[in-house]
Amino acid sequence: MDALKPWHLYLLLCRNGSYYAGITNDLERRFQAHLRGTGARYTRANPPVQMLASHPYPDRASASRAECALKRLPRARKLAWLQAQPRTVHESQPADASITRV
């Protein structure tokens, strides 16, 4: 059944003001892992404050390619990517509550 789930590229805002981009096929589970400190090494050192946006992809390969492209962008271009995402993806709320969207 997991093979049918879309993959998502997501962008987190970290406590130090930096962004973290990653991919997952379960946004809520992955975000909670980052909050617990069991996600990525980067987010253990720089805990996330909120999930800013996500974008679905049909498979892991396309999500991974998009992640690599996003990570190569300068901060201003990452903001442009964020602003281009649909506003219905997530609603703003504190990181300790759930996934967020500004």
Curated annotation (Swiss-Prot):
This is UPF0213 protein XAC3202. It comes from Xanthomonas axonopodis pv. citri (strain 306). Residues 5-80 form the GIY-YIG domain. Belongs to the UPF0213 family. It holds the Pfam family GIY-YIG. PANTHER family: UPF0213 PROTEIN YHBQ (PTHR34477:SF1). InterPro entries: GIY-YIG_endonuc (IPR000305), GIY-YIG_endonuc_sf (IPR035901), UPF0213_domain (IPR050190). PROSITE patterns: GIY_YIG. SUPFAM superfamilies: GIY-YIG endonuclease (SSF82771).
